[in-house]
């Protein structure tokens, strides 16, 4: 595969050979080991590639950067792909490559097709990725959508770079919030029989709770019914619902468990969990986000993984008892305070579950483990790295990526969200309003740790201001050229076009060729830096260059040789746009 990174490697080889020659001549000492950095220039007048090698080695050589640059250039071996080498400024070395070097990029793209840009950079390396993992207590909201789009794109990029990626969703099916969910459904169920019963203000309020309750009533009738009086009798009188609403809520959960008993409580609990989890799965699948595994927290208890983690931390001396609870000595490993692992009632904390889950991940032998969290989890990072050290695991294998929640604007008005309050805008509602493509692209077009103001009106607009529309329109325009071709007496001879790529000599064409050649390098950089926004920006640049070219030139011309060369070029642009959009989870429509 020919691309600009290949050309950079070839230039680096030439520079290494020049350095070795200078060592032989005594200009540089034998122990000098240069780090050769080559960049692609933005101004064609300064060539195609540049290096600051002379500036970095001037001190070791005992001469000015410009003087050393002259000696490096003199020592460069000849190359059939380099037409000119010049020294600029204080000692930068600029390289001009042959036009043929760029033109071979077109043939490489058309030959590789959908595989152009893929590499074996990560061959043999296994990566575990966990993302979204929202509590199954309600539908996904627009905040979760950004983590979903980002995680899916990073997984796609790593896969394109040759890594074997395992995608996982951690299902928190064993925590306090799940008890509150089951309670919320049960009270809505009871309201079908007694209107006087009130839902505690901190319970889940959304309409989806009523839907689950009605389904429960339709299937089981009055099996779970208990009177208001019997419930109130279970609530301690000293608990004030206004003074301590959370304690009041916990008392309700305890009352529910006592009155229903284990079997019926599990039935209500499972109905709520299954309904919401199925909705989450369907929502994500419709959004193009799929997983290899949905890992339930309850499995950690069932398979003894929490106890395994506790035993390992104890073995390494990081567990102690205080006030009837078992604590992790987190401060000894860089955290701000020690953390409770097992409460005095014998129940594990969320923290204990996280220890067990990460121990399980590390025990699978992955080369990289990636956790994608909301930015509000930033304080959790030292905690996780601390317990990994306590477990005797290598913290450097873990990469925690933080994603800022997207802020949705309807007009100039900010939309607030609260899962328990039921006032949130769901991911499904967003997708239905702006479409999957706009949602996927808008979510990832900024760095993940930057705040994202999601402009609904812009996302729906069919204008050049809408970046995803602009990119898709470039693809559709190219498709229209080939449809128009079929209505004429002209033909497209791809082999003949390959033979005449040298005719692609306008500045528009040279610019497009150079940008096409950058695509494989963009994929590698985006994968290694977990940065899909780099690919989004690249596609915007490519689309802009194509639209400029489209407006300036004609393609279905009488000159057979030039026509075929240009059709090959725009076919290559079409392929790269389609490849890039696919990695971002965005469609490439043929008509718009």
Curated annotation (Swiss-Prot):
It comes from the Bacteria. Keywords: Aminoacyl-tRNA synthetase, ATP-binding, Cytoplasm, Ligase, Nucleotide-binding, Protein biosynthesis. GO terms for biological process: arginyl-tRNA aminoacylation. GO terms for molecular function: arginine-tRNA ligase activity; ATP binding. It holds the Pfam family tRNA-synt_1d. Its main location: cytoplasm. It is found in: Cytoplasm. The keyword Metal-binding does not apply. GO terms for cellular component: cytoplasm. It catalyses: tRNA(Arg) + L-arginine + ATP = L-arginyl-tRNA(Arg) + AMP + diphosphate. This is Arginine--tRNA ligase. The lineage of its organism: Bacteria, Pseudomonadati, Pseudomonadota, Gammaproteobacteria, Legionellales.
């Amino acid at each position: 595969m020919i691309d600009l990174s290949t050309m950079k490697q070839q230039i680096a080889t030439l520079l290494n050979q020049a350095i070795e020659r200078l060592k032989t001549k005594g200009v540089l000492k034998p122990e000098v080991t240069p780090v050769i950095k080559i960049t692609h220039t933005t101004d064609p007048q300064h060539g195609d590639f540049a290096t600051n090698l002379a500036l970095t080695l001037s001190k070791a050589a005992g001469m000015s950067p410009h003087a050393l640059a002259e000696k490096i250039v003199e020592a460069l071996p000849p190359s059939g792909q380099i037409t000119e080498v010049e020294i600029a400024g204080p000692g930068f070395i600029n390289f001009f490559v042959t036009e043929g070097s760029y033109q071979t990029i077109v043939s490489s793209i058309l030959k590789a097709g959908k595989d152009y840009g893929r590499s074996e950079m990560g061959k043999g390396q296994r990566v575990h990725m966990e993302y979204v993992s929202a509590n199954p207590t309600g539908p996904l909201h627009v905040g979760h959508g950004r983590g979903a789009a980002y995680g899916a794109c990073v997984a796609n990029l790593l896969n394109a770079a040759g890594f074997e990626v395992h995608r996982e969703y951690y299902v928190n099916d064993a925590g306090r919030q799940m008890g509150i969910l089951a309670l919320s459904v049960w009270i809505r169920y009871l309201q079908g029989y007694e209107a006087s019963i009130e839902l505690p203000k901190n319970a889940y309020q959304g309409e989806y709770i009523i839907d689950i309750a009605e389904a429960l009533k339709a299937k089981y009738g009055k099996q779970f019914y208990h009177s208001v009086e019997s419930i109130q009798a279970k609530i301690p009188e000293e608990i004030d619902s206004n003074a301590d609403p959370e304690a009041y809520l916990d008392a309700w959960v305890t009352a529910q468990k006592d009155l229903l008993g284990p079997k019926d409580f599990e039935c209500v609990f499972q109905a709520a969990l299954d309904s919401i989890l199925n909705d989450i799965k369907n929502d994500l699948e419709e959004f193009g986000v799929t997983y290899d595994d949905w890992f339930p927290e309850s499995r950690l208890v069932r398979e003894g993984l929490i106890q395994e983690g506790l035993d390992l931390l104890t073995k390494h001396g990081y567990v102690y008892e205080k006030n009837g609870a078992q604590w992790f000595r987190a401060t000894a490993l860089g955290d701000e305070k020690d953390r409770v692992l097992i409460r005095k009632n014998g129940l594990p904390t969320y923290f204990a579950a996280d220890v067990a889950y990460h121990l399980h991940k590390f025990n699978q032998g992955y080369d990289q483990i990636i956790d994608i969290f909301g930015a509000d989890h930033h304080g959790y990072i030292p905690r996780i790295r601390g317990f990994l050290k306590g477990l005797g695991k290598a913290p450097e294998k873990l990469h925690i990526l933080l994603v800022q929640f997207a802020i949705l604007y309807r007009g100039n008005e900010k939309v607030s969200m609260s899962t328990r309050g039921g006032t949130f805008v769901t991911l499904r509602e967003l997708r239905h309003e702006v479409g999957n493509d706009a949602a996927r692209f808008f979510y990832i077009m900024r760095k993940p740790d930057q705040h994202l103001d999601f402009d609904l009106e812009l996302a729906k607009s069919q204008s050049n201001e809408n970046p995803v529309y602009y990119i898709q329109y470039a693809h559709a325009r190219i498709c229209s050229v080939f449809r128009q071709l079929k209505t004429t007496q002209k033909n497209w001879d791809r082999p003949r076009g390959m033979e005449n790529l040298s005719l692609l000599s306008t500045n528009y064409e040279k610019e497009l060729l150079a940008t096409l050649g950058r695509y494989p390098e963009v994929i590698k950089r985006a994968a290694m830096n977990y940065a899909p926004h780099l690919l989004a920006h690249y596609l915007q640049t490519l689309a802009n260059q194509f639209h400029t070219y489209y407006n300036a030139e004609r393609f279905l011309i009488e000159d057979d040789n030039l026509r075929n060369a240009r059709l090959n070029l725009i076919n290559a642009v079409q392929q790269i746009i389609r490849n890039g959009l696919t990695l971002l989870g965005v469609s490439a429509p043929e008509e718009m």
